[in-house]
């Protein structure tokens, strides 16, 4: 999900690579679940996120829609996101003790936090969001250890390709922003990459079409 911001205003002014140390370790988020509340529709899910959730919960995409995933407009197209529920607008997958019930399969955005990504011509780098996390006594940790994803090189390739693919779809809609075109593009993305899970591993041949 794109954000139109000045990165200098929300970060420590540094950009990080996967092997850099960054003060992001929240020590298991002991006694805190602030970042799991009030996120609106901002926790947008990638096809790989959905694939992991389906495996973790033994559920289809349709079943996930009844458990805590919803559809909303994101950067011009309709994409799935984690739903917030109740008066406290808590993540649907947060239990009564304020702990994540899908931690092993948590979405990419959740794995990153309090880091963010800034996309460049070739790939991306990370930045530390200094005002987002309520934990003030965070420890230093290597970026790739914090994100904790298997086969990080392939995962990063997927993230870059998925970002480029969505950007291409947005450009298509800039030239034809009619409701019919927006619906056609959105349904194509949802059916191909989420419902049918044509793409479930970081080797996005279909994204290059």
Regions found by a protein language model. Name each.
Residues 154-157, 185-186, 202:
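Alpha-helical protein-protein interaction elements
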């Amino acid at each position: 999900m794109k954000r139109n911001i000045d990165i200098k205003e929300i970060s420590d002014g540094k950009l990080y690579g996967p092997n850099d140390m960054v003060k992001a370790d929240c020590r298991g988020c002991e006694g805190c679940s602030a970042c799991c509340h009030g996120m609106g529709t901002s926790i947008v899910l990638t096809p790989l996120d959905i694939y992991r959730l389906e495996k973790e919960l033994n559920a289809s995409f349709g079943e996930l829609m009844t458990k805590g995933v919803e559809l909303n407009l994101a950067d011009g197209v309709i994409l799935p996101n984690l739903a917030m529920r109740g008066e406290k607008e808590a993540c649907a997958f947060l239990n009564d003790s304020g702990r994540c019930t899908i931690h092993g399969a948590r979405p990419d955005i959740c794995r990153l936090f309090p880091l963010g990504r800034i996309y460049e011509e070739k790939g991306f780098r990370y930045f530390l969001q200094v005002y987002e996390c309520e934990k003030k006594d965070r420890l230093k940790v290597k970026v790739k250890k914090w994100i904790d994803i298997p086969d990080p090189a392939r995962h990063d390739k997927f993230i870059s390709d998925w970002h480029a693919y969505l950007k291409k779809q947005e450009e298509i809609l800039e030239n034809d922003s009619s409701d019919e075109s927006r619906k056609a593009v959105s349904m194509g993305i949802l059916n191909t990459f989420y419902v049918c899970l044509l793409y479930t591993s970081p080797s996005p041949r279909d994204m290059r079409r």
